[in-house]
Curated annotation (Swiss-Prot):
Underlying gene: anmK
Pfam families membership: AnmK (PF03702)
SUPFAM superfamilies in the cross-refs: Actin-like ATPase domain
UniProt binding sites for ATP: G9, T10, S11, L12, D13, A14, V15, D16
Alphabetized UniProt keyword annotations: ATP-binding, Carbohydrate metabolism, Kinase, Nucleotide-binding, Transferase
Enzyme class: transferase
Domain of life: Bacteria
GO molecular function annotations of the record: ATP binding; kinase activity; phosphotransferase activity, alcohol group as acceptor
BP-aspect Gene Ontology terms: 1,6-anhydro-N-acetyl-beta-muramic acid catabolic process; amino sugar metabolic process; peptidoglycan turnover
EC number: 2.7.1.170
Alphabetized HAMAP family for the sequence: AnhMurNAc_kinase
Entry protein name: Anhydro-N-acetylmuramic acid kinase
Family label: Belongs to the anhydro-N-acetylmuramic acid kinase family.
Length: 371
């Protein structure tokens, strides 16, 4: 199947797109990949929607703004893809299926008292009509409904990508987005995956709250700052890090209050160290040291994050490109791959990745897939 995958993360930066040819097990070919920045109006709407979603009481009707946001997300994806297809000389008829994550506005992990909640907004019917292609979407809901974490979902793709690269296990893939998550591929092929802690999200939120821009470009502030070890220790003193894996996070799960008194430079440096130390706590839970840590996602473009990871890591740390991976496109590729698995009824969630009782498929498809 030839599939166009889409991903928009909680950083609300861009629509990522990637073309993949796959049967849902092995990868037969990689097509072009790219991104389109979110329009400010869409970003503002989604920020507002996220704030409302976080205050949404359980058991109450969903907020009215969700429907407006669903349409906006569908339109944003369509317009992004139109320019992407034009740039690469492709047409909608080239694809068997679209795999679309949608925009996360709420993610609450399960507790002993209740199941989790997860909301990815997308008007899939609208997008399918606009594109004239079937759309696979809503990949997390079924997982959460049976008590799973709903995240991360990319691990089964990381395993396929590692096979395609000829990488010998054990190996680990780290995605640094708004939240950081890790996939540990054991020597026997078993998967253990979970959110390690914050990625770029806390740094971005800190800078935005101080009116200093949307992100720390090239890690300049963090590289100019000093880590406050007392604040770092306070940040790491969270029950989340002692909780057994698998487990998941929302980018808003940690408070910025501990860094409020620090300069922007020292706050950024301390938050970078927080991201790195949380990753190394993850290694302690794995029980099997990986031969290498492959870093994907936007965080690998931040020299402060990469330098801190490399300095503190017990294993070699390299960006995805060192292994021939497309680090900015891994998540979009993953949802193309997951779309194929959804179409074929193959599992996308596993006990070691989201905590579901048994491997299970997920996602829904609107529109008809050609035989």
């Amino acid at each position: 199947m030839k599939i166009l995958g889409f991903m928009t993360g909680t950083s609300l930066d861009a629509v990522d797109m990637a073309v993949l040819e796959t049967d849902g097990v092995e990868i037969s070919a990689f097509g072009p990949a790219g991104e389109r920045k979110l329009r400010e109006a869409t970003r503002d709407l989604l920020l507002k929607t996220t704030d409302i979603a976080r205050a949404w009481p359980r058991g109450e009707p969903e907020p009215v703004i969700f429907e407006e946001a669903r349409r906006a997300v569908a339109d944003e994806h369509f317009q992004a893809a139109e320019s992407f297809l034009d740039e690469h000389g492709l047409s909608w008829s080239d694809f068997d299926l679209l795999g679309v994550h949608g925009q996360t506005v709420l993610h609450e992990r399960p507790t002993a008292q209740r199941v989790g909640r997860t909301v990815q907004l997308l008007d899939a019917d609208r997008l399918a009509r606009l594109c004239g292609r079937p759309v696979a979407f809503d990949f997390r809901t079924a997982d959460v409904a049976v008590g799973g974490e709903g995240a991360p979902l990319a691990p089964i793709y990381h395993a396929a990508r590692a096979r395609a690269s000829g990488l010998a296990a054990p190996v680990a893939a780290l995605n640094v987005g708004g939240v950081a998550n890790i996939t540990l591929i054991g020597a026997n092929g078993d998967l253990l995956a979970f959110d390690t802690g914050p990625g770029n999200g806390m740094i971005d939120l800190m800078l935005q709250a101080r009116g200093l821009g949307r992100f720390d470009e090239d890690g300049r502030l963090a590289l100019a700052g000093r880590v406050d070890e007392a604040v770092l220790a306070a940040l790491l003193d969270s029950p989340y890090f002692d909780a057994p894996a698998p487990k998941s996070l929302d980018r808003y799960d940690f408070s910025l209050t501990p860094v409020d008194h620090l300069s922007a430079e020292d706050a950024a440096a301390t938050l970078v160290a927080f991201t790195a130390e949380a990753v190394f706590k993850a290694f302690a839970q794995s029980g099997e040291a990986p031969s290498a840590l492959i870093v994907c996602g936007g965080g690998r473009h931040n020299p402060a994050i990469m330098q801190t990871l490399a300095a503190r890591a017990p294993v070699p740390v390299k960006s995805a490109e060192a292994y021939g991976w497309r680090g900015d496109s891994i998540e979009a590729e993953a949802f193309a791959y997951l779309a194929a698995r959804t179409a074929k009824g193959l599992p996308i969630s596993f006990p070691g990745t989201t905590g579901v009782p048994a491997p299970m498929t997920g996602g829904r498809i609107v529109g008809l897939i050609s035989a």
